Structure formats: structure tokens, C-alpha cells
Design a protein with these regions (language model features):
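Flexible, low-complexity junctional segments that flank or bridge functional domains
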Residues: 38-240, 244-592, 596-599, 603-612, ...
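Bacterial N-terminal signal peptides
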Residues: 25-35
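A hydrophobic, small-residue-rich beta->alpha segment in the mid-to-C-terminal subdomain
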Residues: 712-724
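Alpha-helix C-terminal capping segments
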Residues: 663-665
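N-terminal secretory signal peptides that target proteins for export/translocation
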Residues: 1-20
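Flexible, gly/ser-rich surface segments that form the specificity/activation loops bordering the active-site cleft
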Residues: 676, 680
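Flexible, glycine-rich surface segments
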Residues: 242-245, 632, 642, 646, ...
Length: 745
């Protein structure tokens, strides 16, 4: 291979003779300038000084800071969840927030994060200047066409902004002067299969996990007509993609570095703009077969050999100086004798010591941003429910600015209101360490016509069939309006259930307005009771339906309070042998983790539901892990006769998972009311102040791949009780199931 330096020398001499040829020559002469960078800059410390910012963003600053913190929290090489979250709290304290100051404050306190002023530069169109045998490339948008007579190439990486499209522009530049693909370094990054549960130590049975492994990068594709020698011009600060490009090419011995050394930490970072400032967040460690690459990639020449000093960026080396230097062949391997001090990302674990209960405006703001960032990365249903989380975040932050947060219940309510926009029936928020209720309103409520109606009660003077019309003088319609605005749910029935549950917690005696089945409203003062009234809508045990006039039919209640094990299920199913029909009650919550009960109810091979989990391979590559299986039936005992499935608005999650398979196999007739439309393993997010937020972490589809979320199990036959039915203890859904099994209608 010809000496690139001799070619550069020839080109510079040619350029000097032809200065009158115009602006292109002047540009080349200027861009060949450089500064001398001493060996003292080869330290890996203060890598922030060597990064180039990118443009700002159109996103509101809180949304952008949420994204930056999400990168740090879930992909960064710095501290774990809790320490990064506390840095965010510190940055967001006060009566209001200066988002630029908060960005700097946050970056100062988090390892692997740098705050920089955003740049106004954008990625311009690619430029190719030809000076004799030298092609000078300024990467940018559009194709790169290298003149046929070119014998060497200079690619200028200086002052390129960390703007969208830069990585692709650089790939086009090297591709245009290569006939063979150029290998790229792998990057050790954190992988996420769903969002790891932050409350429970991970086990082999965990649905979600994270781990750290190398991620291979595709080589730079070759599109050129000739393999040309390449020199890269580097400045004191580079955009992350430009630094990555330089490290890739120099480690592959594909290019020389001229100008300033390249700090590998910059190449391992990602630009995250916030407002007038932004952050470089380091998310990887670059590696090859020998391990981590050096912290600093030294230049092959600082150009001081050519008579240039610091600050002489407009100077041009003399032709004599260039001719005196000859680098032939390919660059020598980069020296790797200096120990690498850059850390790699580490696996994230659940916290061993939980955050203490605390409240402040900074905690509330930080928790809102943390929850927003986590759902942005891991909530799977935006395509189904719509994406309103940015506007909801701004709405909640405005409330914090308006009313300072002084107790944990305020933070909890803000987070509940945020979660409401997800329309997710698992969207709960718990305040650890908050005040304990004085007791409970010990009734079991059902929803009839949009009103809470008592199904069971152990409270004196409160009876089944009573409709709750008010609480402490607040009309129930008004009370429910406030609470449903803080209740996340995918279907109306479950939304009412989530809101109405909050009637149960009592801080002291309360007066309830109650409308009896006779239409008369009375007011009853209720004392808090020591226990809640829990359980499924019905506690009826498995057995014959002879007491309801159908001795030929059998009933099985799968609620965990009634049938708590697979062994009990087998015994109940054996007792049902010979029945002409079976009523399967899934209005409660089952306790079966295996597919065995379904295998004994479906006599032919069947498909499971489709489980789709979000997967991040480092911070850039998103995909899905999808699982669906075919299951074989089991016998002895089993049941192959007609089955009616009972569901209702409290049929949620595991109840629905059981039901999805039965309905997907077309094994049952469904009677009752629509279920909650919420299934999938919960992701649990632990935040400062002792806040624990839940959301569904995987997408669930029916076995035929149709949408489940927000649809739920829809009855073939609608059946809704009345207040009179509840007062009489009449199970109308069960009676309707019996009617169908006996008449087929």
C-alpha cells in the first residue's frame, strides 16, 4: 500500500500550487490543521471534557429528563437503581425546577453521566473534496461519491454533532472507500427481558430478568470500488458516534488517527438532550477477543511532527515536513499494556434494603419521572391503549408545583393518577410506611348499574342489596368520579371495582347513605371493623347442583379460598364424572400455577395464550420475546362434557389466563359479565420515598393472536344480578348457566 503521508504531502503541495483554484482548496488546507495533544491527555479521567454534544430536543424538558434517567437507571455503567434515583430527587427538589440546572446537578452526582450544553449544529449534507490524489470526506446526509482517481482518503470527524443520522453517515463514508467489510467492536451492555422485579430476588422462575453480555455489531458494509488508505482527523471533543467510529476503525487497523486522542468512554456513551443542556450517558464497554479496549486510543500523529502547535488549527504543514514522514502499510496494533479502568455495566438486583418512607416535592417529581421512564421502556400496551403518558407527566408535575408535597399519600395519589392513563388493571401504587387504616368497612361490594351494591356484610344495619349512595355527605357519583380518575383499569367493570375498593379503608367512623331494595335511603354510622371482608362472589363448594333443581349437573368453584390446590381440583373433577354438564366458576381468583386443570378439561391438544415480553439488547435494540405452546390433554380424571364458564368484572389476571385457554379452545360457553381485560406478569418498580408501582410487563394475546387487553373474556350470554337478587342471596349467573346446560338456550 502506498504511504498515505506521501499522498497527503503530494496533495498539500498540489493544493499550494493551486490556491487560486478557489474555496475547496482553502477548506482542505484549513481542515488539515490540528493541535498537539500531549500524553497527559491520555488519562481516562474527565472523559466528559472530550465529548461533543448534539442538538436539543422538541420534547418537554421533564419528558426528556425522564428518558435520560431511564437510560442511566436501566442501561448505565454507573450506580444502581437507588443511588441514581436519589440523585434525581436531589436535582428536582424545590418549589419549582430549573431543568437545565437540574440536568447539571444530576450529572454531577451520577458516575458515567456528563452534562453538556446542547449544540445548534445539525448534520449537513456530505461533502467530498478532491485535491490531487486525496479525497477529503466530511460525513453527512446523502451518498458519498469518491473520485475514481483518489489514492487516499481523509475523513474529518471534528465538530460533527451528536445528531440523528450521524452513525449512518459515518458508515457511508468508510463504505465508499472499502472493498471488504470493516469489523466493528462488540459492546458489553445490559440486556433486559422485561423489567426485572425490584422487590423480589430473581430466580430461575422469574418472568423478567436482566443480564450483561457482549452485543455484536454488524461490520461496516463495503460499497467502494477500491480499498483506499484512510486517515481520520480527530479534534479535542467528538460526538459519541464519531468517537465510536474512530475506535472501531483504529482497533481494526483500518485507519490512522491524526489530531487528538480518542477517549473510549465517549464512544460508549449516548447523547440525551434535555433542554438547553443534555447528557452523555455511558451505557457500554467496547471489547474485542482480547477483552476491553484501551481507555484512550492515542493518535498516530498529533501533527506536532509537522510543525504545528496548540492553537494552530488554521495552519498547514509544510510539504517538506509531510515528505519526511512515511507511514506505509497498515497501522500498527494499538498498545494494550496499560490496564483498563473503565467499568462495564453490571447486572441489576432487587434492593436488599428498601427505601424509607419519606415525602417531598423532589421525591414526588423524581418518582413521576422514574415511573414515566420505566413505562416508556417496558409497558407493552401503548399500541392498544394509546400513548398519553407525556401529557399526564406534565399534568402531575404542575400539581406538584402548585401544592408542595409533604406526606406520602400525596405522592401515592399523584402516581395513581399517572398510572390511570395506562388503562392497565395491574396499575396499582403502594405507599410503604404510610399510615395504617383505623379499620375497614366490612362489606363485599358488587357493581350494578354503575353503583356499589352490598353483596355480603358483617356490619350491623348494612344488608345485602343495599346500594351505597353517599359517604360522609359526599354523593357516591361524585366520590366515584374522583376515585375512578385515580384508578387504572382496562375495562369499565374493573375500573369501578378498583375505585370502590377504596371505600373499604376507614380512618374513623363514617356515615354511609344506603338505599334499600324498598327504595328508601337511610344513613348509617359505621364503626371501622378489624378485618376486611374478602373472597370471591360465591363461596359455594364443588358438588352437585341438585339443590338448585339440577342433580344431573355439577359445579366447581376455582377461587383459591374454595379450591386451593391441584389435588383438590382432581378430587372435585373425579366427583363430577357422569354429570351431563359442568359449571366452572372463575369469578374469583384461582391458585393454580400449572396447566394441569386445563389439560383435564380440554380433551384435545390446545394452544396456550401468546406471551410477548419486551426485550432490550442494550439501549438501542428493542424487540419481543414471544412464547406460545401446544399442550396435550390429560385423563383420569377428566371431563369431556359441556361446560359453562362463569366470569365477571372481578375475574382478573390468573382467572382470565385460565379462561383465555378455555375460550381459545372453544371448550366453554361463557355466562356472566365481561372480565377485567388484564393479564400478564406484573412489573414492580421501587422508588424513593418507599413508593412501589405496578404495571403489566408483558403483552398477552388470545391463542388465535387476537387482542385481549381491554377486551377480556366477553360472555356469550350476559347475566347481571339486581339488588333484589343480592338481597335474596340469589346467584343469577349460576342459575342462567344451569338454564343453558339444561335447555341449550
Amino acid at each position: 500500500m502506498s504511504s498515505i503521508w506521501n499522498l497527503i504531502s503530494h496533495g498539500v503541495c498540489w493544493a499550494r500550487r493551486g490556491q487560486r483554484r478557489g474555496r475547496g482548496t482553502a477548506v482542505l488546507l484549513s481542515l488539515l490543521g490540528g493541535s498537539a495533544w500531549g500524553q497527559s491527555l491520555l488519562s481516562a479521567e474527565s472523559w466528559c471534557d472530550f465529548g461533543q454534544a448534539g442538538p436539543t430536543t422538541a420534547l418537554p424538558a421533564p419528558v426528556a429528563l425522564s428518558a435520560a434517567h431511564g437510560q442511566t437507571r436501566f442501561f448505565g455503567t454507573g450506580p444502581g437503581y437507588h443511588d441514581a434515583d436519589l440523585a434525581l430527587v436531589s436535582a428536582l427538589e424545590g418549589s419549582s425546577v430549573d431543568w437545565d440546572a437540574a440536568t447539571s446537578h444530576y450529572a454531577d452526582r451520577v458516575e458515567g453521566v456528563c452534562a453538556l450544553a446542547a449544540s445548534s449544529r445539525t448534520l449537513r449534507a456530505a461533502q467530498v473534496l478532491s485535491v490531487g490524489p486525496i479525497a477529503f470526506i466530511r460525513p453527512g446526509t446523502g451518498d458519498v461519491q469518491v473520485p475514481r482517481h483518489s489514492r487516499a482518503v481523509i475523513i474529518d470527524l471534528r465538530e460533527l454533532p451528536a445528531a440523528p443520522g450521524l452513525e449512518e453517515a459515518l458508515a457511508r463514508a468508510i463504505g465508499a472507500v472499502s472493498t471488504a467489510p470493516v469489523a466493528r467492536l462488540s459492546e458489553r451492555v445490559r440486556h433486559h427481558i422485561g423489567m426485572t422485579d425490584e422487590m423480589t430476588p430473581e430466580s430461575e422462575y422469574s418472568a423478567y430478568r436482566n443480564f450483561v453480555e457482549p452485543r455484536a455489531r454488524e461490520p461496516y458494509a463495503a460499497t467502494g470500488r477500491a480499498e483506499l488508505p484512510v486517515a481520520l482527523l480527530t479534534g479535542p471533543a467528538l460526538a459519541p458516534a464519531a468517537a465510536r467510529f474512530a475506535v472501531d476503525l483504529r482497533m481494526a487497523q483500518r485507519a490512522w488517527l491524526v489530531g487528538a486522542p480518542v477517549h473510549t468512554a465517549v464512544a460508549e456513551s449516548k447523547w440525551m438532550p434535555v433542554k438547553r443542556k443534555g447528557m452523555l450517558v455511558r451505557t457500554a464497554r467496547l471489547e474485542d477477543a482480547q477483552g476491553a479496549v484501551p481507555d484512550v486510543i492515542p493518535v498516530d500523529s498529533s501533527l506536532s511532527h509537522f510543525g504545528l502547535g496548540v492553537g494552530s488549527s488554521d495552519s498547514v504543514p509544510s510539504a517538506q515536513a509531510l515528505q519526511a514522514t512515511s507511514f506505509s502499510g497498515v497501522p500498527t496494533p494499538v498498545d494494550r499494556t496499560t490496564p483498563v479502568v473503565r467499568n462495564a455495566p453490571e447486572k441489576r438486583f432487587a434492593l436488599e434494603v428498601l427505601p424509607p418512607s419519606a415525602a417531598s416535592s423532589g421525591i414526588a417529581r423524581a418518582d413521576l419521572l422514574i415511573l414515566h421512564g420505566a413505562t416508556r421502556l417496558f409497558f407493552p400496551y401503548f399500541g392498544t391503549v394509546g400513548d398519553g403518558i407525556d401529557d399526564r407527566l406534565l399534568e402531575m408535575l404542575a400539581l406538584v408545583d402548585a401544592v408542595p408535597v409533604t406526606h406520602v399519600q400525596q405522592t401515592q395519589r399523584l402516581l395513581l393518577r399517572f398510572n390511570e392513563v395506562l388503562q392497565d388493571g395491574h396499575g396499582f401504587v403502594y405507599a410503604r410506611g404510610g399510615p395504617t387504616p383505623a379499620g375497614y368497612f366490612a362489606v363485599y361490594l358488587d357493581e350494578i348499574g354503575g353503583e356499589p351494591v352490598v353483596r355480603r356484610s358483617v356490619v350491623p344495619d348494612v344488608h345485602p342489596g343495599d346500594t351505597v349512595t353517599s359517604v360522609d355527605g359526599v354523593p357516591m357519583a361524585e366520590w366515584l368520579s374522583v376515585e375512578t380518575a385515580h384508578a387504572s383499569a382496562a375495562t369499565p367493570g374493573w375500573k369501578h371495582e378498583v375505585a370502590a375498593r377504596r371505600l373499604v379503608n376507614m380512618n374513623g367512623p363514617s356515615t354511609f347513605g344506603l338505599r334499600g331494595v324498598d327504595g328508601v335511603t337511610r344513613f348509617v354510622q359505621v364503626q371501622p371493623q378489624p378485618q376486611m371482608l374478602l373472597g370471591p362472589p360465591s363461596f359455594r363448594g364443588a358438588g352437585s347442583l341438585a339443590d338448585l333443581g339440577a342433580p344431573e349437573l355439577h359445579y366447581m368453584n376455582l377461587a383459591n379460598q374454595v379450591l386451593s390446590s391441584v389435588g383438590q381440583f382432581r378430587a372435585a373433577l373425579a366427583a363430577a364424572q357422569g354429570a351431563s354438564g359442568l359449571v366452572l366458576d372463575l369469578r374469583g381468583y384461582p391458585n393454580f400455577g400449572s396447566y394441569e386443570p386445563r389439560r383435564r378439561l380440554i380433551p384435545t391438544p390446545f394452544l396456550t395464550s401468546v406471551f410477548r415480553t419486551p426485550v432490550w439488547t442494550g439501549p438501542e435494540e428493542f424487540g419481543w420475546q414471544e412464547e406460545q405452546g401446544e399442550i396435550e390433554p390429560m385423563s383420569n380424571p377428566s371431563f369431556s362434557g359441556p361446560i359453562v364458564l362463569l366470569v365477571g368484572p372481578k375475574s382478573v389476571s390468573a382467572s382470565e389466563d385460565f379462561s383465555m385457554v378455555l375460550t381459545g379452545a372453544r371448550r366453554v360457553k361463557v355466562v356472566g359479565r365481561r372480565s377485567a381485560g388484564t393479564n400478564g406478569v406484573v412489573a414492580r418498580l421501587l422508588m424513593p420515598g418507599g413508593m412501589l408501582a405496578w404495571f403489566t410487563g408483558m403483552e398477552m394475546l388470545f391463542p388465535d393472536r387476537s387482542t385481549f387487553h381491554g377486551v377480556g373474556i366477553v360472555p356469550d350470554i350476559e347475566s347481571t344480578p339486581t339488588a333484589v337478587d343480592l338481597a335474596a342471596g340469589r346467584d343469577t349467573e349460576l342459575l342462567r348457566a344451569i338454564e343453558y346446560l339444561r335447555t341449550g338456550q
